[in-house]
Amino acid sequence: MSNRITFAVVTVATLVGGAVLWQIHNQKEIPRAAAAVTVAAPAPPVRTEERKEHDDGESREMAARAIEATKRPVDTKKTAAVADAGSPLRAGETWQYSAIVSMLSSVANLRLKVAEKRNFLGKNAWHLQAFAHTENPFRMVFALDDQFDSYSDAATLVSMQYEMHLNEKGQTVDSVQRMSPAVREAAPADTIAARVLPGTRDPLGMMQYLRTVDWAKTPEVRSPVYDGHKLYDVHARLQGRGEPVTVPAGSFNTFKIELQVLDNAVEMKDAHFILYLSNTEARLPVLLEAVMPFATARVELLKAE
């Protein structure tokens, strides 16, 4: 799977629904071990290192694939800024989404959840989750049941640990990556140390971070985002305020946010993302539009709890 497709899969799946969107067109067979740690060069300064061997040969293959990059394409200035003091995150929040591709009916469903605020590695952290599943009839040809877990700093939503538990077409991959800006910080057993830039967020943390931004005062934010494979630079820009949006969950006035994704300082031209956040204190992610060369996708909010 190409790096661009990998990012789109994780972004669409974990931000607002349906890892299937890019895989419909581009899915290839992925070795179980490779999927957990692949970082293609040239890349931003991310490296993954296996600190301890797993009980099977897969972990040794993971370690063999670990690489260290040398370029620094992202501007990390203020990327770890403290989230809005009036953060809208609440423990137990859950959102249900449906992913629609072009003229097809729902091909996947997604559930996002703010599971809890807890102590993690001695710090206050949010435990964020996403669950993606394909639906019939597409499920008959591509069965997908994925879960993503993020432990993100409660103040900044900077990633501390990112987990991918993938089950796609009967093939399973489990990856637990500890975010580590420090060069020699050890990772515990069954965990990979991912060397990332300070202030790096994972896709789940980035989604929630966008909710904390006061878009009436801040027209643009930037952040490095690590998707479990590679580091990207994400620029989020306010494109409109009071945009009317209707989805199954209801009608909303929204902030229209353009998401620009840069791979090694070069903008990804083959995908264009627009995120709509409700113009309320909750700033609910109500709709994502993804325009791709082969299809247009809408990920719509079905229900918020």
Task: Describe the function of each predicted region.
Residues 1-12:
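Membrane interfacial helix-start segments of signal peptides and signal-anchor transmembrane helices
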Residues 7, 15-179, 215-305:
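Acidic, serine/threonine-rich low-complexity disordered tracts
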Residues 179-226:
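Active-site/ligand-binding surface loops and adjacent short beta/alpha elements
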